[in-house]
Structure formats: C-alpha cells, structure tokens
C-alpha cells in the first residue's frame, strides 16, 4: 500500500473536593489559534507526518523499521484522531504500519521479550485498539505476548518494574507511560484478576514515592533502588535534574491509565491526587513569556537551556485531558491555552506546500551508558542540553495531535450549560 494515495492537503491537593465551576465563557478560551482550530492543527500535523513517512515504516529519516515506542505513540494518536474525523487514511496508515509487524501467529517481528524493555510494551496500546476494531486473532495474540512480558519483568526490592533488563534496579518516569495504560486496559478487556490493576497502581505509586521532590514540585527522571549508578544520589537514588519530557511521560501515564480504572477502585483517588500534585508543579515552572516549558524544567533561561516542544505538547495534552475528565479544575484552562498558543507560535512552521513541522524537539535522553555522541548520560544539566534538537520527532508529533484533540473538547465545552458545582473525581 502507498500511503500517499490517502493523504490530504497547586490548585488542588486532595483527590476529592468541591470547587466552584466556572462557566466556560468566564475564561476567554480561544476557538482558534493562529487561524486554525486545535482539531485542524491536529489533522494538519498528522497528515504532514504521514506524508513524510510514506509507506517506509521507518520512524526516523534514513532509519529502518522496528518495533518502537515512538511508533506506538504516533499510531495511537492517529487512531484517536480517527475517532474524531473518521478519515480512512489514518486507520489505513496504522493498520499498514503496526499490522506489518504482526503475522497470523501473533509473534511480533523484531520484538525481543528477553530484553525486558518497557518501551517495547507501548505499541501494545495500538495493538489492543486494532484488535477491538478488527477482531483479528493476530492482534489479540500479540497483545497477550506483550502482557506476558510483565509477568516476569525484573523488579526492584519493593516491586517496581526495572526499566529494562540492562538498567538493573532502575525505575524511570518514562516506563510508566510505556506499560501502565496498556496493562490497565488489557486487564479490563480480558477480565484479569483485581491484582493486575492493583499492580498498575503500585507502579505509579512507587514512582511518585521515590522520584517526587517536594521543594520544586517536580519529579526526577530516574530512581536507582541500589544507589550504585553514577547518575544516582547516594542517599535517595534519584537522578539529579528534572527533565521535561520525562515528567511529560509520567503526566500522560496518569491521565491515560485513569481511563481504565473503575471509579470504585481504591487506588483511583491516589492516582488523581498524584496528577493534581504533578499539575501544580508543572504550572509553577511554566515560562511566563511564552507559556512553554524548558528542557531542564527548573533552570529557566540558564545558558544552554531551551524551550522544548515534546514536553510542552505532553503537558498540554495531560492538563487538558485532566480538565475534560474533571480531575483538574477549570482554572487550568488559561495555562493550557497559553501553552498551546506558544507551541503553535514558536514551534510549528508551515512549508510552501502547506505541510506542518514541529521544531525544537529533544531527540533523545536517558540515564547511564553514553550518548550517540559519546557523552556520559550522567543526568547532569550539561548532558540534557547536549542531546540533538530535531524536527518532527514522533515523541512530539504524537502528543501535539493528542493535545489538539483534548483542547478541541475544551473549546466545544463553551456551549455547555453552566452548573453550580463540579466534583473532582
């Protein structure tokens, strides 16, 4: 299949409380940003990225196709977009891309279970969606294969998943996004015992317990249970800086995992409280001039630091979804609006053919070993700002599409009748 045939041109601190509800008109929520609605921006970015990728199934320019967490993020964003606009090209792209890895027996091409990478779980969200759409057995088999990895995933002494086999005794914020929503959704679809959801909640709680810094209101990128890694504090085990995208991953994990937690689950309130705590910290570190967020979040305009697109898009998505689901109060809407306007104004550019591009994306960052440039990934400020800055990284494109969808819901809520009170779940 050739894809181009389908292409077109600190506000709350408890888990449950009552807040006065602002009628949407009470906050000036723009319906358009730089002349387009959020939905139009999402469609434009999706179609532009599909055109760039074509049918090569390679997620980076000049690269080769592989089972990859960024592929999972981008294809999931296309499916969420398809739910809204119902354009065949989006579903066809996803089916071609993810489906090409999965033969009839459900054994995923390029997937290596023995590496125990939480990153490899992330495309499973798209697999579950395709199974629900198509009911093809291969997708159910592939999802079960990914789920079985978590049964034997190495764990820290208190039960937290290692991020990868080679990252011994380490939990990273990233890993919560990769595995928690998938595991929670799988548990519901296939009627797993209550212990499955309990374990998802435990992973979220452990990351909160070990990586949260009360002074800044932010979360450290990683935690070493043994305090032996070169990047780890010898007392706390935490890495030394607050990387924007890592916190963005964690934010998205919270709002997405909540989709699959019943309202009567005892851990649901705790997850919402963690989201509220995170949102307060994110708000405190928003750049006041642009509405965006920095690569190293608490370092502002320090030389070398820069306003970064992937984290900013993740925060807009997470905050907007939090408001839409009443986990966060409506007072966050001006924050969300300012941030989205900042992304469109400062990060999105349009070429002569009308294609959109997302600039100022940190290409990659991690902890331990060395970067592609040979620099130790030591968690320092200098390390985080040394990684390449690229355009159209799927870790930014996917969240930008999702952010537009959630903000569009907020825009449309302007027509909703006012109520006197609203309860945060």
Sequence positions of predicted segments:
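Bacterial N-terminal signal peptides
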Residues: 10-23
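CBM-like carbohydrate-recognition segments
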Residues: 31-72, 84-91, 100-118, 122-124, ...
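Long, well-ordered core segments of solenoidal/helical folds
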Residues: 38-58, 92-110, 141-160, 194, ...
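Acidic/His metal-coordination segments adjacent to aromatic residues that form catalytic metal sites
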Residues: 54-56, 102-109, 160-165, 227-240, ...
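Extracytoplasmic mature domains of secreted/periplasmic and thylakoid-lumen proteins
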Residues: 113, 117-178
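Inter-helical turn/loop segments and adjacent helix faces that build the functional surface
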Residues: 186-197, 257-269, 322-330
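Oxyanion-binding "anion nests"
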Residues: 251-300
